């Protein structure tokens, strides 16, 4: 700063001196010429006393009047002062302008880089904003592996109707680029996920599939599963129970049977005949559900009618999970 101020002061002083020299040269030349001619033509007395009148130098000394030289010198002095003022005003103007430029330069130096307005970058941004999407897409350079995806996206964008402003070529290129990073698996139309309609979506088909599976799980009706509107009965696990009893009949038309509260034993309304083996042994196997408790009895049948019941309370049987042999005696638990 000190060097700048000193340079400005020296320059201002030189400019002021030059202006004063020019003003002196312009004002002194006419005065000299005008004063030389009267001195040559004037009498000796007037030349000796230019301020006196025709009567001599005594009267001139009592009432002196300003001479031409004094007027010229005063005019020169005024001009010099005026020139000095003009030069000072010019110097002050130059100093003010230099100080303003220096302040602007300092401000640019101390302002952060991100805050300084850059007209070049602003013009570039306006130019890039005015560019069409086609030119921007053309400037992008994609890897070789994604060129095919970009072409496919371009064909899809061309097939879309022109009235759709939401999908342009730039967006299609970006979608194709993002799709290029993912691995796609081709699934046949008749897959386990079912077919997706043109107006539907994969999410909708998946929801319908899950809903169908839930309905199939919760469609147990009357001990069976409901499949396509039909009830399919599911039989529980069964075990084989072999009933045996010794009884000697009096006639050949008589035989021993078993009945009980389970439907496999007749439900107390009918009976299950036992087969005669030998030595008065009757036996027969019946399938009953596993882990079930049933009540039953032996009966004597003659001419297809129950003629005798065991003389005891109802027998109870726990089927369990394995085959069993129930060997009882008539009327004895």
From Swiss-Prot:
Acts as a cargo receptor for glycogen. Delivers its cargo to an autophagic pathway called glycophagy, resulting in the transport of glycogen to lysosomes. Residues 31-73, 106-139 are annotated as: Disordered. GO terms for cellular component: endoplasmic reticulum; endoplasmic reticulum membrane; membrane; perinuclear region of cytoplasm; phagophore assembly site membrane; plasma membrane; T-tubule. PROSITE patterns: CBM20 (PS51166). Residues 50-61 have a biased composition (Gly residues). It is found in: Preautophagosomal structure membrane; Endoplasmic reticulum membrane; Cell membrane, Sarcolemma, T-tubule. GO terms for biological process: glycogen catabolic process; glycophagy; intracellular transport; substrate localization to autophagosome. The modification Phosphoserine is found at residues 67, 135, 162, 191-192, 201, 205, 208, 216, 219. The keyword Membrane applies. Residues 1-6 are extracellular. Interacts with the ATG8 family proteins GABARAP and GABARAPL1. Interacts with several glycogen-associated proteins, such as GYS2 (liver glycogen synthase), GDE (glycogen debranching enzyme), GBE1 (glycogen branching enzyme 1) and EPM2A (Laforin). Residues 233-332 form the CBM20 domain. It is a single-pass type III membrane protein. InterPro entries: Carb-bd-like_fold (IPR013784), CBM20 (IPR002044), CBM20_genethonin_1 (IPR034838), Ig-like_fold (IPR013783). It holds the Pfam family CBM_20. This is Starch-binding domain-containing protein 1. Its main location: membrane. Residues 24-333 are cytoplasmic. Signal peptide: none annotated. Ubiquitinated, which leads to proteasomal degradation. Residues 124-134 have a biased composition (Polar residues). GO terms for molecular function: cargo receptor activity; enzyme binding; glycogen binding; polysaccharide binding; starch binding. It comes from the Eukaryota. The gene is Stbd1.
